[in-house]
Amino acid sequence: MEAAHSKSTEECLAYFGVSETTGLTPDQVKRHLEKYGHNELPAEEGKSLWELVIEQFEDLLVRILLLAACISFVLAWFEEGEETITAFVEPFVILLILIANAIVGVWQERNAENAIEALKEYEPEMGKVYRADRKSVQRIKARDIVPGDIVEVAVGDKVPADIRILSIKSTTLRVDQSILTGESVSVIKHTEPVPDPRAVNQDKKNMLFSGTNIAAGKALGIVATTGVSTEIGKIRDQMAATEQDKTPLQQKLDEFGEQLSKVISLICVAVWLINIGHFNDPVHGGSWIRGAIYYFKIAVALAVAAIPEGLPAVITTCLALGTRRMAKKNAIVRSLPSVETLGCTSVICSDKTGTLTTNQMSVCKMFIIDKVDGDFCSLNEFSITGSTYAPEGEVLKNDKPIRSGQFDGLVELATICALCNDSSLDFNETKGVYEKVGEATETALTTLVEKMNVFNTEVRNLSKVERANACNSVIRQLMKKEFTLEFSRDRKSMSVYCSPAKSSRAAVGNKMFVKGAPEGVIDRCNYVRVGTTRVPMTGPVKEKILSVIKEWGTGRDTLRCLALATRDTPPKREEMVLDDSSRFMEYETDLTFVGVVGMLDPPRKEVMGSIQLCRDAGIRVIMITGDNKGTAIAICRRIGIFGENEEVADRAYTGREFDDLPLAEQREACRRACCFARVEPSHKSKIVEYLQSYDEITAMTGDGVNDAPALKKAEIGIAMGSGTAVAKTASEMVLADDNFSTIVAAVEEGRAIYNNMKQFIRYLISSNVGEVVCIFLTAALGLPEALIPVQLLWVNLVTDGLPATALGFNPPDLDIMDRPPRSPKEPLISGWLFFRYMAIGGYVGAATVGAAAWWFMYAEDGPGVTYHQLTHFMQCTEDHPHFEGLDCEIFEAPEPMTMALSVLVTIEMCNALNSLSENQSLMRMPPWVNIWLLGSICLSMSLHFLILYVDPLPMIFKLKALDLTQWLMVLKISLPVIGLDEILKFIARNYLEDPEDERRK
């Protein structure tokens, strides 16, 4: 049934053809079940394990590696002689890498449990219905409830469907619907129609929503919608329709992978084609097929060389280390790739309650009557410090601390606050904080009484647990609470009937203490309290009181005001009818006005600084709240989202105002606005969508079930530590302390991580360029193999992997939060950087080939061949005139490979030092700024020595130990790379504009 909230109870009953007293007939139940289906949310069909595994192999680079492994395996199968074992090492290692990557990928996907499944926990098991086949109420499975059923709910029940209330069987009906609407206090319900068909859920005061809890009272209602048609069902559908997009880095790496795979394919084909003329060379035994296979193996080696196999592992390690650092700052990251996305966040959409504010209501102002002289009335106004539930703070008058006990009016005000109250404070010893027990508003009054300490109770030596309610206990010992007249909507107040405690010697009789909405309470006041006397309430006095309340309720403060009053001579207990709430109003008359307290959910202390940080970093903060617009704007001014006197006409909207705009203007509004008030969850998703259409990277906070679709849709969903399981599972990050400032710290960490990732991705790529150049040169010049695939894998995975990981520990730039967010479209490697890495890669490749050639031509223990012999070694036979007296097997010696590999590893270590900073010289940023890098370089070199000097590793890697002369030659060839990169950095610093600066302009 659509818009049930706007229909009268009679219309709802008529729509389903049902009577409130008897309920549906079995025949109607059957028809409705066929028409509407079962009252349950359909289970989400997850991907099978096999589908997840297959997904991991959809990446182009992974497929190229898999192909290389299969080809290597086939070639190894036909290998002869002692090379058989080493030939199998390469495909085996490649497969191991691919399996490890797939396991990590599947584990990550499985770990992000399905938020949709978490919604199931809000489905109640059972429900209580009236049906025509039985006289009394019957308990049935909640899934069997159908639209039109008459359902009974009572305190403690979970609402089984969306229900239109027909009648309330108690004084009041309070519902905790925070999971759905985010309202922090329980909501009082009624039965009258809500005329607005487009009312937001918060305003549907005659509806009970599936999954919410009855906090107090008992009621009868008719089921309007079930299953996926309920509000919680709509949320499920929104989440199911939201596809997870790839993070900017994942997109960049995918693009890079595609480009790399095209380049690899071209180079492999080119190498094979260049050497067609050599297929018949004597070294292949004159067999064309053997020659073709040999060059095919070189093409496979090229593919292995060009792909940075260690990159996925290094990225995962760097992100994992980043998540550990963030966890120390109270940001728990659930999805690794989102660590980097945080770095490009350009908009943060934050909930108000509990994130920008403390979600701990506190009284910050109060007043009592100072004196009344005819029509003249003056007030005593006080302000109170402290913005949490901790009983710490001072009462100030004209900014000077005072003792509350000196003012009789304050003593009575404190008495009303303590007694007209069902809440208390509790010190949580595990968390070390004071927490509320009961309603937020009442806890604020409890805290106020503790701060006022009107009877000068000695509290200094009390433990924190005893301190929590010390001053309230003193007041409660003086007066005994007999009974409570519960809050009701018609009078907007509640009261307690108290009698003096036996031990109390004060000459006071029974009293009624009242608190409630100012207009309602003040209308029933005939007197005002001045000191200990009471004076008649006159028109001007009333005007004065109401004008101050109005002033407090608007403007910068927008305080929530409560009026406090006493009935000095209440009726006798036995004369009062307590089961008829309609008569409570007449008992709460002839009141004496005592004072007013103004409270608010105060902004967190550190939020203002964090918002300034966001402004400096080019990040827009949008506050989204269910509060009314006035309160929302006031909080925005208070925390610095809006300036004190800034015009906010087109920068703040209510959900309704936003909906009334044409679509194009809605999109434009999202580009400008910084405040959305009175919004529904669907608005959050819409706002994210519009922001994404402007290429903004959005972080969205939320804690309720209602926030889950928007959390899932935003690039960074941020759930509160105190939020629901659904919100947490739909988000990328959880704030352990629910604090906005933690988001800003996480953004800073994300930026630092991206900068470091850029460095090590570029470092690994320049290494691969060098390897490709090396293999391409040997093939193009017709030289013997300088590096074989198993050696390349060792370099890519182990020796390069360690320094690359250590580059993740580079300290962040000092101005990291003074730059605008980077564009997600910014390339990983720009034109100049591409040239730089080609230049460095070219040097690496040439140096590696040069080292191998040096051994053949000039080394003391080498064969001393000529350049012609070296480049035509394929034609070497015993009877070939050009190779007279030369053992042809020398061209397969391990020494030149060892020289080439040692030069490659040493140059890569120098390159790691070059990567400490993109453009800063090593003179400005010496190696010891990152001690981890120095450690990893030492470890990489140790591992290189291991494969050179510890048997049987030299045999597996086809290497031989080097002597001192050879090592000196390795250093001579390797060290110039530092000088080359310093020259390129100098050019970048002095003659080319820094791309960061260019973007800032």
From Swiss-Prot:
Mg(2+) binds at D351, T353, D703. The chain crosses the membrane at residues 49-69, 90-110, 254-273, 296-313, 758-777, 788-808, 829-851, 898-917, 931-949, 965-985. Residues 788-808, 932-943 are annotated as: Interaction with PLN. One of its GO terms (cellular component) is endoplasmic reticulum-Golgi intermediate compartment. SUPFAM superfamilies: Calcium ATPase, transduction domain A (SSF81653), Calcium ATPase, transmembrane domain M (SSF81665), HAD-like (SSF56784), Metal cation-transporting ATPase, ATP-binding domain N (SSF81660). Disulfide bonds join C876-C888. Ca(2+) 1 binds at V304, A305, I307, E309, N796, D800. Skeletal muscle (at protein level). Skeletal muscle, fast twitch muscle (type II) fibers. Its main location: endoplasmic reticulum. One of its GO terms (molecular function) is P-type calcium transporter activity. It catalyses: Ca(2+)(in) + ATP + H2O = Ca(2+)(out) + ADP + phosphate + H(+). Ca(2+) and ATP binding cause major rearrangements of the cytoplasmic and transmembrane domains. According to the E1-E2 model, Ca(2+) binding to the cytosolic domain of the pump in the high-affinity E1 conformation is followed by the ATP-dependent phosphorylation of the active site Asp, giving rise to E1P. A conformational change of the phosphoenzyme gives rise to the low-affinity E2P state that exposes the Ca(2+) ions to the lumenal side and promotes Ca(2+) release. Dephosphorylation of the active site Asp mediates the subsequent return to the E1 conformation. This is Sarcoplasmic/endoplasmic reticulum calcium ATPase 1. It comes from Oryctolagus cuniculus (Rabbit). The gene is ATP2A1.
